[in-house]
Amino acid sequence: MSDFRKQPLTAETVKAKALELGADLVGIASADVLNAFPPDPKYPQTPDRISPHVKSVVVIVQHIPAAVFRCKQMVPVQYMDMVILRRMDKVATKLAMWLESNGHPGFVTAAQETDWNMKRASYGYLSTRHLGIEAGLGNFGLEVNILTPEYGPRLYLTGVLTEAELEADEPMQEQVCVGEGCSRCLHACPGDAVGHFD
């Protein structure tokens, strides 16, 4: 893309646009940092694995209403998941199109994608949890989900990968999870998936 259409963009302008489009939270991660420190170096989930031109990842959060987790059946949860993922994809796509209209190409990664060649399991091209942590939106809880101060673990994340060089947010220093002294996630897990702390 030629530079004549390129408009100067700041991280604050991009984040304000994402919020205007409907994101609940937004942060920015540096592609260089994500490339240098993949969550699992053996199976690198990095932006350069997708495109060598990515400079920044705009991380978008959509929260899941807490009330849906109080339902007796899974159907409302599944329906809300579907609605929220669709909404998040629309917000991210509109942001990518807006970035491009300002001369900064960008594209969306699917929040729920799987590359079956990696680990033979549900393992996407990017770890959205790690994107959120690097973008300063939250940190890991005992159950290894991202926790945000605003929504706890009840959220979905996606990323808009862009060629725009934006100032990255700093990872949170304060822990959202208070650790084993709380252990609410351990006791609430119906499958006892995190019982290894007992």
How should each PLM-predicted stretch be described?
Residues F4, P76-D198:
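Catalytic cores of enzyme domains
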Residues M1-M88:
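Non-catalytic, usually N-terminal nucleic-acid engagement modules in DNA/RNA processing proteins
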